């Protein structure tokens, strides 16, 4: 229904962003690692969207490019994979990394994500192998956010909230917190990326 939304990014939360369209409507959009959009705060952007209608809600999901959106739509067709699990996978990996894991039948890689057990990882491979095309990485896919003059301690707190929203356990987050507290960051996205890297390593 909504292929994409163009507007100003007005708010950023651990699980979602708010984009105000040209007609003044604010769209709440669920995203994988919302802090990747941090540099667009109060700026205009295009976010590629998919509307999912459930009995109790209509939810918009948003992505940095069409490739990421297509990967999300492929993942949620797999039995046992809901939107939250698909977002958690894409928060940590580029679409190409997921596709390579599928094509190489790398179940171990897929089970590193919250909510993905051995059975579900095998189902992803069975359902999607041969149906996903590995493409050349774009700069959009590898979007890097840099915000200057931010307080590292607050950035770590926000990063931990983002990881919790993705479904990681308190024990896993506690492990990440120790790593993040030893580092300094210029943006929440930078802290989230290190946290995700720690969790899947």
From Swiss-Prot:
GO molecular function: ATP binding; four-way junction DNA binding; four-way junction helicase activity
Main localization category: cytoplasm
Spans annotated as Domain II: 65-143
Region span, Domain I: 1-64
Keywords associated with the record: Cytoplasm, DNA damage, DNA recombination, DNA repair, DNA-binding
InterPro entries: DNA_helicase_Holl-junc_RuvA_I, Hlx-hairpin-Hlx_DNA-bd_motif, NA-bd_OB-fold, RuvA, RuvA_2-like, RuvA_C, RuvA_C_sf
Tree of life domain: Bacteria
Sequence segments annotated as region (Flexible linker): 144-150
GO biological process, one term: DNA repair
Pfam families: HHH_5, RuvA_C, RuvA_N
One Gene Ontology term, aspect cellular component: cytoplasm
Annotated stretches, region: Domain III: 151-201
Record-linked HAMAP family: DNA_HJ_migration_RuvA
Family recorded in the similarity comment: Belongs to the RuvA family.
NCBIfam families: ruvA
Subunit organization: Homotetramer. Forms an RuvA(8)-RuvB(12)-Holliday junction (HJ) complex. HJ DNA is sandwiched between 2 RuvA tetramers; dsDNA enters through RuvA and exits via RuvB. An RuvB hexamer assembles on each DNA strand where it exits the tetramer. Each RuvB hexamer is contacted by two RuvA subunits (via domain III) on 2 adjacent RuvB subunits; this complex drives branch migration. In the full resolvosome a probable DNA-RuvA(4)-RuvB(12)-RuvC(2) complex forms which resolves the HJ.
UniProt free text on domains: Has three domains with a flexible linker between the domains II and III and assumes an 'L' shape. Domain III is highly mobile and contacts RuvB.
Annotated function: The RuvA-RuvB-RuvC complex processes Holliday junction (HJ) DNA during genetic recombination and DNA repair, while the RuvA-RuvB complex plays an important role in the rescue of blocked DNA replication forks via replication fork reversal (RFR). RuvA specifically binds to HJ cruciform DNA, conferring on it an open structure. The RuvB hexamer acts as an ATP-dependent pump, pulling dsDNA into and through the RuvAB complex. HJ branch migration allows RuvC to scan DNA until it finds its consensus sequence, where it cleaves and resolves the cruciform DNA.
Protein name: Holliday junction branch migration complex subunit RuvA
Species of the source: Staphylococcus haemolyticus (strain JCSC1435)
């Amino acid at each position: 229904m909504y292929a994409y939304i163009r507007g100003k990014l007005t708010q950023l939360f651990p699980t979602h962003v708010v984009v105000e369209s040209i007609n003044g409507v604010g769209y709440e959009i669920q995203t994988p690692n919302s802090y990747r959009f941090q540099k667009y705060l109060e700026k205009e952007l295009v976010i590629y969207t998919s509307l999912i209608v459930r009995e109790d809600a209509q939810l918009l999901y948003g992505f940095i490019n069409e490739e990421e959106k297509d990967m999300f739509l492929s993942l949620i067709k797999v039995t046992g994979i809901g939107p939250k699990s698909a977002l958690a996978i894409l928060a940590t990996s580029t679409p190409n990394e997921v596709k390579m894991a599928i094509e190489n039948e790398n179940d171990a890689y897929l089970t590193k994500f919250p909510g993905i057990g051995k059975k579900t990882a095998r189902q992803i491979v069975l359902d999607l192998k041969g149906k996903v095309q590995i493409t050349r990485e774009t700069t959009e896919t590898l979007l890097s956010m840099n915000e200057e003059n931010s307080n590292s301690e607050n950035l770590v707190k926000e990063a931990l909230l983002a990881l919790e929203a993705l479904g990681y356990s308190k024990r896993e987050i506690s492990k990440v917190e120790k790593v993040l507290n030893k580092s300094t960051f210029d943006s929440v996205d930078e802290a989230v990326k290190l946290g995700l890297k720690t969790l899947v390593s």
